[in-house]
């Protein structure tokens, strides 16, 4: 298995170290995986911008952000931003499973994939060029809305979200849950495989001398 890592902490605990802007959260929603681990992000009735966000670690090069989302009165915008402006955003139509408006100075691509029962995995890929960044989900009224729109919510409708991930690379891989630290799976780059036993009771490295046949 190729090495993978979710760099975003508290990846499905949006009531911990995540920031809320003019929104409320309701936990215990039915998730894409049949669990009750999804969250409903509900815009409040103030005429404002509404989103849930988190600062992400700096990684030079290409990064991909992903989250599972479902329509519950609003569509979704994935956004990655820095002090002074957005770096990438993409809108997603959660009723029809299509991409909407997107933009930003560092955007590469976005995708939406159905996972059943009205749930979609939405992704946003971009070039990391400056630190620090924040990433988040914004409930939007229309897939054609601009970046981080302002409006007054009804206090009831929202968007369901579950399992946020930030990883290095252009493709969103299988979700890895995190709490207070990043979590790695598979064989990571620049790390040796320590899985040779040779009769030993614990994993070890097999080292052999290099030989050359001169005939």
Residue spans for each PLM region:
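Extracellular and organelle-lumenal recognition/adhesion modules and their flexible linkers in secreted
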Residues: 1-215
């Amino acid at each position: 298995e190729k090495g993978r890592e979710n760099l975003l902490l508290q990846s499905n605990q949006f009531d911990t170290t995540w920031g809320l802007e003019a929104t409320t959260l309701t936990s215990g929603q039915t998730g894409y995986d049949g669990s009750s681990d999804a969250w409903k992000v509900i815009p409040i009735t103030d005429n404002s911008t509404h989103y849930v966000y988190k600062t992400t670690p700096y990684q030079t090069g290409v990064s991909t952000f992903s989250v599972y989302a479902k329509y519950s009165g609003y569509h979704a915008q994935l956004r990655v931003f820095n002090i002074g402006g957005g770096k990438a955003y993409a809108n997603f139509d959660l009723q029809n499973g299509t991409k909407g408006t997107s933009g930003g100075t560092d955007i590469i691509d976005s995708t939406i994939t159905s996972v059943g029962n009205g749930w979609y995995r939405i992704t946003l890929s971009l070039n990391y060029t400056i630190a620090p960044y924040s990433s988040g989900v914004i409930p939007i009224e229309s897939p054609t809305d601009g970046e981080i729109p302002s409006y007054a919510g009804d206090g009831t409708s929202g968007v369901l979200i579950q399992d946020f991930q930030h990883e290095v690379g252009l493709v969103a891989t299988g979700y890895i849950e995190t709490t207070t630290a990043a979590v790695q799976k598979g064989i990571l780059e620049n790390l040796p495989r320590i899985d040779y036993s040779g009769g030993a009771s614990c994993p070890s490295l097999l080292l052999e001398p290099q030989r050359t046949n001169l005939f």
